[in-house]
C-alpha cells in the first residue's frame, strides 16, 4: 500500500527495508549491506573488522553505559568477540548484499571474504533452480521471486 505512494513521490525501494530519493541512499547502512568493515564506538556498538589475512572479527561493546565506561577505564569495553568462521561467511555475505535490490558485484565476495565463487556455487545453483537468483548470474542479486522470498534465498547459504 505504501510502496506506490512512495514511488509516486520519487522514492526508490533500494533496500529490503529502505526507500530513498535518487542519490539520497543511507551511506551509513550501505557500508553494512555491502559487507564492509566498521568500528564500534560507544555502549552497545558492534564492529566488523577484516584483518590483512582475511580473518573477519566481530565485536560487541558492553550494552549499559555504566558497564561500558567501567570496562573501558579498566582495560577494554569489548563484551564479546568472535572470529567469523569460513563456513559462516557465505551466509553473512548474502544476508547483507542481497538486502540491496541491485545486489553486489561478483568480485565483492573475494574482496570481502575468504571465499571464492566456487565455494558458494552449490548455493547459487540451488537458488537458481528455485528461481530465486537469475541465470546467468552477473551480480549477487535476486529475481523478483527471490526478493519476495528474501529470507528463504539467504537461508540457502547457511
Residues covered by each model-derived region:
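A short, conserved structural fragment
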Residues: 15, 128-138
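Short secondary-structure transition/capping segments
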Residues: 25-29, 130-131, 148
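Short amphipathic alpha-helical interaction segments
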Residues: 114-129
Amino acid at each position: 500500500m505504501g510502496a506506490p505512494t512512495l514511488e509516486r513521490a520519487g522514492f526508490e525501494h533500494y533496500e529490503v527495508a529502505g526507500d530513498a530519493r535518487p542519490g539520497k541512499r543511507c551511506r551509513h547502512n550501505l557500508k553494512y549491506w555491502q559487507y564492509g568493515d566498521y568500528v564500534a564506538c560507544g555502549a552497545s556498538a558492534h564492529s566488523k573488522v577484516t584483518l590483512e589475512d582475511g580473518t573477519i572479527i566481530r565485536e560487541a561493546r558492553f550494552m549499559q553505559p555504566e558497564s561500558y565506561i567501567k570496562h573501558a577505564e579498566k582495560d577494554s569495553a569489548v563484551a564479546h568477540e568472535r572470529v567469523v568462521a569460513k563456513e559462516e561467511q557465505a551466509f553473512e555475505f548474502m544476508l547483507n548484499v542481497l538486502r540491496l535490490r541491485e545486489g553486489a558485484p561478483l568480485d565483492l565476495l573475494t574482496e570481502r571474504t575468504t571465499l571464492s565463487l566456487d565455494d558458494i556455487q552449490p548455493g547459487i545453483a540451488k537458488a537458481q533452480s528455485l528461481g530465486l537468483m537469475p541465470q546467468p548470474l552477473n551480480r549477487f542479486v535476486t529475481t523478483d521471486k527471490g526478493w519476495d522470498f528474501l529470507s528463504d534465498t539467504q537461508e540457502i547459504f547457511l
